[in-house]
């Protein structure tokens, strides 16, 4: 039996509720896959600030680095919006990513046939969409120096090094090898020097993956093509700010952010989390959709632990639950046969995953 240590960071708002359901499903799939999980909880976000005065206590970093993976819920809320920037929950998350050395954000976007009417786009446009946005996470304009402002000007600097581009490109090509073997690198090489370097380095890395087809696209065109014909994409490789925008755009292809997981991975350890926020307005009501967090646990099994069979079981269980008409409140208007609470949806998926 394989044993894995998982750090649980439940966070704020609906975070504790959705993490509990993901753990329920992990334990269910462990029972039939000869796996065992041990969990250690840690604080981050507003809840951490309330208890310790710091949105990211050192203990949380230590627990995470001593684990095989981190399963994370969500942080933030209006309660903490007026704190100094360095004390806000979001500041803790940025520091957390830096401490763990995560540099790649993986955002899958696929469309469940059972929920095809939830999308704003026509069914014939999105049916069969299955893409992955691979976004560089700790470089680019969000972190470049110099940056600042005075009364009349503000400035930021977009910087990428060859090393940063090489490692994110390898991540994208390795993922493509397990998918449809196509990478589209997104840049703005027609006007940005940094994008010209990006494109040159990606072309160099591509030579190590001759089975993978590489194409290039300017970011403005990519934003349009995601709406016009999203099925043309398999793996979309891009930098921090472009990926920030494109991954949010791609997330709406499915029609609900409550369905979509993500991973932030690097040399040390990976963090697996839903793409949605902490939704404090519905916290404690038992109506949050846990599917994105459950699918984040599946990504954790696949990319952090190499347990592809267990991940496949969770993915199939989610699909079965949706096919049979189970819906949480956010999806109730889309062919629901039974509207479930957060806990009920977790139990249904756990039951299917255990078979």
Curated annotation (Swiss-Prot):
<dbReference type="Pfam" id="PF00180">
    <property type="entry name" value="Iso_dh"/>
</dbReference>
<feature type="binding site">
    <location>
        <position position="220"/>
    </location>
    <ligand>
        <name>Mg(2+)</name>
    </ligand>
</feature>
<keyword id="KW-0460">Magnesium</keyword>
<feature type="site" description="Important for catalysis">
    <location>
        <position position="188"/>
    </location>
</feature>
<dbReference type="GO" id="GO:0009098">
    <property type="term" value="P:L-leucine biosynthetic process"/>
</dbReference>
<dbReference type="GO" id="GO:0005829">
    <property type="term" value="C:cytosol"/>
</dbReference>
<dbReference type="GO" id="GO:0003862">
    <property type="term" value="F:3-isopropylmalate dehydrogenase activity"/>
</dbReference>
<dbReference type="InterPro" id="IPR024084">
    <property type="entry name" value="IsoPropMal-DH-like_dom"/>
</dbReference>
<feature type="binding site">
    <location>
        <position position="135"/>
    </location>
    <ligand>
        <name>substrate</name>
    </ligand>
</feature>
<feature type="binding site">
    <location>
        <position position="97"/>
    </location>
    <ligand>
        <name>substrate</name>
    </ligand>
</feature>
<keyword id="KW-0963">Cytoplasm</keyword>
<keyword id="KW-0464">Manganese</keyword>
<feature type="binding site">
    <location>
        <position position="248"/>
    </location>
    <ligand>
        <name>Mg(2+)</name>
    </ligand>
</feature>
<feature type="binding site">
    <location>
        <position position="220"/>
    </location>
    <ligand>
        <name>substrate</name>
    </ligand>
</feature>
<feature type="binding site">
    <location>
        <position position="107"/>
    </location>
    <ligand>
        <name>substrate</name>
    </ligand>
</feature>
<comment type="pathway">
    <text>Amino-acid biosynthesis; L-leucine biosynthesis; L-leucine from 3-methyl-2-oxobutanoate: step 3/4.</text>
</comment>
<feature type="binding site">
    <location>
        <begin position="277"/>
        <end position="289"/>
    </location>
    <ligand>
        <name>NAD(+)</name>
    </ligand>
</feature>
<comment type="subunit">
    <text>Homodimer.</text>
</comment>
<protein>
    <recommendedName>
        <fullName>3-isopropylmalate dehydrogenase</fullName>
        <ecNumber>1.1.1.85</ecNumber>
    </recommendedName>
</protein>
<comment type="function">
    <text>Catalyzes the oxidation of 3-carboxy-2-hydroxy-4-methylpentanoate (3-isopropylmalate) to 3-carboxy-4-methyl-2-oxopentanoate. The product decarboxylates to 4-methyl-2 oxopentanoate.</text>
</comment>
<keyword id="KW-0560">Oxidoreductase</keyword>
<dbReference type="GO" id="GO:0000287">
    <property type="term" value="F:magnesium ion binding"/>
</dbReference>
<dbReference type="InterPro" id="IPR004429">
    <property type="entry name" value="Isopropylmalate_DH"/>
</dbReference>
<dbReference type="GO" id="GO:0051287">
    <property type="term" value="F:NAD binding"/>
</dbReference>
<keyword id="KW-0028">Amino-acid biosynthesis</keyword>
<comment type="similarity">
    <text>Belongs to the isocitrate and isopropylmalate dehydrogenases family. LeuB type 1 subfamily.</text>
</comment>
<keyword id="KW-0100">Branched-chain amino acid biosynthesis</keyword>
<keyword id="KW-0520">NAD</keyword>
<feature type="binding site">
    <location>
        <begin position="77"/>
        <end position="90"/>
    </location>
    <ligand>
        <name>NAD(+)</name>
    </ligand>
</feature>
<dbReference type="InterPro" id="IPR019818">
    <property type="entry name" value="IsoCit/isopropylmalate_DH_CS"/>
</dbReference>
<feature type="binding site">
    <location>
        <position position="244"/>
    </location>
    <ligand>
        <name>Mg(2+)</name>
    </ligand>
</feature>
<feature type="site" description="Important for catalysis">
    <location>
        <position position="142"/>
    </location>
</feature>
<keyword id="KW-0479">Metal-binding</keyword>
<keyword id="KW-0432">Leucine biosynthesis</keyword>
